[in-house]
Amino acid sequence: MAARQTALGALIACRKQGAWSDGVLKEYVRRDQLDRREAALAARLCYGVLQNRMRLDFYLEQLVKGRLRDLQPVVLDILRLGLYQILWLEKVPDSAAVNEAVEQGKKYANPKAAALINGVLRNAVRRRMTWREPQDLATRYSHPQALVRLLAGEMGPEDLEAVLAADNQAPETVLQANPLAGDPAELPAEIQAAGGSCTAHPWLERCFLVSGVGSLERLEVFRQGLCYVQDAASRLAVRCAG
């Protein structure tokens, strides 16, 4: 599937070039001409691997003979991508995740690497209910140990885990209507006409929760400046500042 190739390309760029994931993913989605559904899957895969990399590596260390750092980097990228689908994406059949990863191994590495990928991921399918789970919060939620220690000094263990878990959730897309460019009340209908979902934010005026649109740059209302992306936390900071 094209979405997996796009996601892998973005992961490779992030690793090799230190690329900003959001920027490179948008570039690759345009390059590969993904439709709305494929673009959404590519984003889920890319961000999912990046957000859960430490936990993915914890599991892979139980499946791979030898050290992960001895693997060809692109092979490790492919293993992470395949394992993420097996563990987090219920709608993706295990067989599809494994087979696509094997094909990526053949394309980006070599037949020997493809055989390793096949064995590791099939083993993951068999063992995922019996392997060891990470006990430390840094690994479980794939956050830097130093950050976890810092947060632990500011809050109790239950709040700490809740914050780390929330930080790993897929963020909502929030659009701020531009009242100088058009009527904010018309924004939901425009986005719904383009095939997306758009509802008023529950506690931020002129803000809307949007999903199912793929790349926002495809929306006419976005290109015309009728709305722009603004995270809810950023908007709250403005309100608090008066």
Q: Residue spans of the language-model regions?
A:
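SAM-dependent Rossmann-like transferase core, predominantly class I methyltransferases
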Residues: 210-242
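Class I Rossmann-like S-adenosyl-L-methionine
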Residues: 1-218
